[in-house]
Amino acid sequence: MAVCIIDHDNIRGVIYFEPVHGKDKVLGSVIGLKSGTYNLIIHRYGDISRGCDSIGSPEIFIGNIFVNRYGVAYVYLDTDVNISTIIGKALSISKNNQRLACGVIGISYINEKIIHFLTINENGV
């Protein structure tokens, strides 16, 4: 399981990469964006010393997230990404090729409460 904490200006979120019910998923939530569609992209480096300017070139497009009118995006995407290959890289939230927020992907312990909560969100139970 891997996790990325996003905390840039007023944009905050937590994104998990983990297997759920035998499939690899990207799960989490983001707040602070204007309503609309945004891209989740993994970048070459996990260097955020200069914010999102130092994370290098885009490597993997994860998918689109949709922010509602309240500025909240609930993330639940399928992915083919091998989690072990993205540890230490950066994840960005971007729109129109502009990086709006980013964070470093790190190893996370498995927290059954989080997994249960995120699974509940997907199934609506």
Swiss-Prot record:
GO terms for biological process: superoxide metabolic process. One of its GO terms (cellular component) is host cell cytoplasm. The keyword Disulfide bond applies. Disulfide bonds join 52-102. Gene3D superfamilies: Superoxide dismutase, copper/zinc binding domain (2.60.40.200). Belongs to the Cu-Zn superoxide dismutase family. Virion protein with no enzymatic activity. This is Cu-Zn superoxide dismutase-like protein. It comes from Camelpox virus (strain CMS).
